[in-house]
From Swiss-Prot:
Substrate binds at residues 27-31, 46, 77, 154, 209, 327. Keywords: Cytoplasm, Decarboxylase, Lyase, Porphyrin biosynthesis. InterPro entries: UROD/MetE-like_sf, Uroporphyrinogen_deCO2ase_HemE, Uroporphyrinogen_deCOase. GO terms for biological process: protoporphyrinogen IX biosynthetic process from glutamate. Belongs to the uroporphyrinogen decarboxylase family. This is Uroporphyrinogen decarboxylase. It comes from the Bacteria. It catalyses: uroporphyrinogen III + 4 H(+) = coproporphyrinogen III + 4 CO2. Gene3D superfamilies: 3.20.20.210. It comes from Escherichia coli O157:H7. Its main location: cytoplasm. Its EC number is 4.1.1.37. One of its GO terms (cellular component) is cytosol.
C-alpha cells in the first residue's frame, strides 16, 4: 500500500506526538456541499450513491478538495448491515430510513442471516478499495459501523424514533429476544468492520447514536456489552500499522470510564460533555475526539474561532485529541464556515504541541 503522507489522525488516536491537532468532521461528505448534492442527483437516490463505488469515492473525496482535513471517512450508511439482513430498507421523504419488515419477536431474529461482508456488503468493500486507491496516501481512511443497540433501534422500531417505546417494550418484556438480536448484530458488525480493515480502512469507528436514551444499567447490558464484544473481535493491526478503534455514544458522557475499559483506543464526545473533565477522567487510557456543537458553524467566523480556542484550551497541552464536531455537520451550514473551523484548529493548536 502507498506510504501515508499525513498520519496525524492515527498518531493522535494512539496518543503519540503530533505537530498540530488533527481535525475531521462527522458527515463531512454531505448535503452542506453543493458538489455533493450534484453527485447525489446523478446517482438518483441515497442508496444508489452508497452502492456505486466510483460515486461513493467521489463524495468521500469532495471535502478533502475543499479543506485540509486529516482523515477521510467512508461514504456509507449505518443501515447497510440491517439492509443486508433482508429487512427491506427504503427512504421515506421527510421521514428518513424505514424498514418494510421490522423485527418483532425472537422468531424474526432467528430468521435473520449474518451477512457475508464480501457478498451482500461487497459494494462497501469495493468503495473502501476505490477510495484507498484514489486517496494515494494523502490521509487515512476511516471505516465505520453503527453499534448493535443503535442498529437494533431502527430494526425493531421500523425506522427512526423519538421515544423508542417499541424497542424498550422488547427490552423490558422480552429481553431474551433483544439479546439474541444484539448478539447477531455484534457478530455481523465485527465481520463487517474486519472486512473494511482488510479492504483498506486504516481506523474504524462505532457509532452508538442512540445509546444515550438508556439508563446506566441498561446501557451497560444492551449497548456497551455488545460494543465490547466487537472491539474484542477486531483486527487491531493491518499493513504493518495499528488500526485504532473509536467508540462514540451520543449522550454517553456519564459513562466514559466504562467505555474506556473496552480496549478501544479513543472515545468520541458529543458537545454536552466538557472535554477538560473528560480528559481528567479517562485521558490516561484513551484519546478523545470532539467536540464542538455542530450548530456553532452557523456563527460568524470570529465566534467559531473563539469556540475552537476554548475547546483546545479545555483539552490542554499534549497528545490524544482529535478535533471534531460533537455530531454530524448540519446540511444548511455555509461551506466556508466549515473551512474557518478546520483552518482554526490547525492554526490555534500548534502551541499545545510544542
Amino acid at each position: 500500500m502507498t506510504e501515508l503522507k499525513n498520519d496525524r489522525y492515527l498518531r493522535a488516536l494512539l496518543r503519540q506526538p503530533v505537530d498540530v491537532t488533527p481535525v475531521w468532521m462527522m458527515r463531512q461528505a454531505g448535503r452542506y456541499l453543493p458538489e455533493y448534492k450534484a453527485t447525489r442527483a446523478q446517482a438518483g437516490d441515497f442508496m444508489s450513491l452508497c452502492k456505486n463505488a466510483e460515486l461513493a469515492c467521489e463524495v468521500t473525496l469532495q471535502p478533502l478538495r475543499r479543506y485540509p482535513l486529516d482523515a477521510a471517512i467512508l461514504f456509507s450508511d449505518i443501515l447497510t448491515v440491517p439492509d443486508a439482513m433482508g429487512l427491506g430498507l427504503y427512504f421515506e421523504a421527510g421521514e428518513g430510513p424505514r424498514f418494510t419488515s421490522p423485527v418483532t419477536c425472537k422468531a424474526d431474529v432467528d430468521k435473520l442471516p449474518i451477512p457475508d461482508p464480501e457478498d451482500e456488503l461487497g459494494y462497501v468493500m469495493n468503495a473502501v478499495r476505490t477510495i484507498r486507491r484514489e486517496l494515494k496516501g494523502e490521509v487515512p481512511l476511516i471505516g465505520f459501523s453503527g453499534s448493535p443497540w443503535t442498529l437494533a433501534t431502527y430494526m425493531v422500531e421500523g425506522g427512526s424514533s423519538k421515544a423508542f417505546t417499541v424497542i424498550k417494550k422488547m427490552m423490558y418484556a422480552d429481553p431474551q429476544a433483544l439479546h439474541a438480536l444484539l448478539d447477531k448484530l455484534a457478530k455481523s458488525v465485527a465481520l463487517y468492520l474486519n472486512a473494511q480493515i482488510k479492504a483498506g480502512a486504516q481506523a474504524v469507528m462505532i457509532f452508538d447514536t442512540w445509546g444515550g436514551v438508556l439508563t446506566g444499567r441498561d446501557y451497560q447490558q444492551f449497548s456497551l456489552y455488545y460494543m465490547h464484544k466487537i472491539v474484542d473481535g477486531l483486527l487491531r493491526e493491518n499493513d504493518g500499522r495499528r488500526v485504532p478503534v473509536t467508540l462514540f455514544t451520543k449522550g454517553g458522557g456519564q459513562w466514559l470510564e466504562a467505555m474506556a475499559e473496552t480496549g478501544c483506543d479513543a472515545l468520541g464526545l458529543d458537545w454536552t460533555t466538557d472535554i477538560a473533565d473528560a480528559r481528567r477522567r479517562v485521558g490516561n487510557k484513551v484519546a478523545l475526539q470532539g467536540n464542538m456543537d455542530p450548530s456553532m458553524l452557523y456563527a460568524p467566523p470570529a465566534r467559531i474561532e473563539e469556540e475552537v480556542a476554548t475547546i483546545l484550551a479545555g483539552f490542554g497541552h499534549g497528545e490524544g485529541h482529535v478535533f471534531n464536531l460533537g455530531h454530524g455537520i448540519h446540511q444548511d451550514v455555509p461551506p466556508e464556515h466549515a473551512g474557518v473551523f478546520v483552518e482554526a484548529v490547525h492554526r490555534l493548536s500548534e502551541q499545545y504541541h510544542r
